[in-house]
């Protein structure tokens, strides 16, 4: 996460894996999580109606790193899940801002917004400078909302809220 920073490096790794009979893959562990799989199925089936927005928080206190910032360390997990929930469509706009509070030039916290062609916005907050651990992804749609809280035990990790939007005239 990421596999590498340049396409040439990726090609070399693919060739090396092919020549040695090895499997090469990026460590997007959440792609195989049963709750993420259920989230994908519910969205594909239209159970949430029109998706309005997605939020994700991956926050904790520490481990402070010197070789990478919080975005590189934490966000690949959430980005991979958000992209899969959006049918692997790439965003048409990405905005990211962050703050380096502990070490100059190494962001401890970042806020990222991604806009997709269908109007869905995804908001992502990652930080290793936060008082408590939070690993939560929320999907809000016109016919329901889902919250995936990866800090809870498995039976409680995924909660579906069936509340429709009531429009005022």
State where each predicted segment sits.
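Beta-strand-loop-alpha-helix segment that lines the small-molecule cofactor/substrate pocket
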Residues: 1-31
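Alpha-helical elements of Rossmann-like donor-binding domains used by nucleotide-donor carbohydrate transfer enzymes
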Residues: 12, 38-41, 81, 111
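Basic phosphate/pyrophosphate-binding loop/patch that engages nucleotide-derived ligands
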Residues: 14-23, 37-51, 117, 140-145
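C-terminal glycine/acidic-rich active-site capping loop/insertion
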Residues: 29, 141-169
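Rossmann-like dinucleotide-binding domain that binds NAD(P)(H)
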Residues: 61-132, 136-138, 151
